[in-house]
Amino acid sequence: MTPIFLQRSLVEELKALFVDFYSTDDISKTPPKVNVYQQDLPIALGSEEDETVPYIIVRIDSGNIPELNEQERVEVILVFCIKANNENRQGYLDVMNMIQRVKERFFKNFSVGKYFYFEPPFEWAVQDEDTFPYFYGAVKMNFYCPGIMLEDPLL
């Protein structure tokens, strides 16, 4: 199973995980649809930019296979974005809630899809730059994919 299958599994998992997510900025109390994208945002045409927010990007960052017949470790970065228009600038709370939701999910159950599993560390950060009304955060996680087994009869 390739890192791309891992990425697809994570996209589906995160869509399900955030189906009932509420923003602290939303006075209507209707959950906004959290968009989940593979690797990057789609190209925005015209005024479509705000339609992507809130979003999560599932980005494959790097990977390695330390030795023959071993599992592949894939580093994945999740990027979170929320738009919060309120004057108290509390959009970071939504970002932190999203990070917490992901953390709880993967520390309670390491597996995702049929073939992949998370292994700590779990690293997170929030943006310190002022990008009001947009608030950002990120998570770095390691996942393991099944290894490729050597089939050479000469070895």
Short names for language-model regions:
Residues M1-A16, D61-Q71, V112-L155:
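Short, charged interaction patches at domain edges and termini
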Residues M1-L68, L154-L155:
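Small/polar-rich, solvent-exposed N-terminal microdomains that initiate assembly or binding
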Residues P54-I56, V76, G137-F143:
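A short hydrophobic beta-strand element
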Residues V58-N85:
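Active-site-adjacent structural patch at catalytic or cofactor/ligand-binding sites
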Residues R73-E75, L93-N97, P153-L155:
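Short intrinsically disordered coil segments
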Residues F80-N85, R101-F106, C145:
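Glycine-rich loops and low-complexity Gly/Arg-rich segments
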Residues C81-V95:
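Short histidine-centered catalytic/ligand-binding loop motif
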Residues Y92-G113:
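Short, hydrophobic/π-rich interface segment
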